[in-house]
């Protein structure tokens, strides 16, 4: 669900868990105008989207590196729409971005994407976990 609401409106809607992010990239299948946002040039990016069939799309792009220049908001819109997103939004894309995949055969998480930082990895208070509840181990360090 995309939208701006007060805490009380969210509770009245039955929302139990929520994240705040932006700018919106795609809403109801239409590309959004993202002009006026800071950091609009090439930067590390993270985005989340959802297709009409309910599937989630999560994208990470490193940047400010010789091997990866980063992406613009317009790049994110194009990628998300190419993969069928009907709704998508930008998340924080700096060194707080990690994409981790758990091994199919053992409980051994592997880092797929880690956006570089001069200061090393950041501790994060919030993460997005995708999978069946009985298969998600939240005890990673």
Give short role names for the model-derived ranges:
Residues 1-141:
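Gly/Ser/Thr/Pro-rich low-complexity, intrinsically disordered segments
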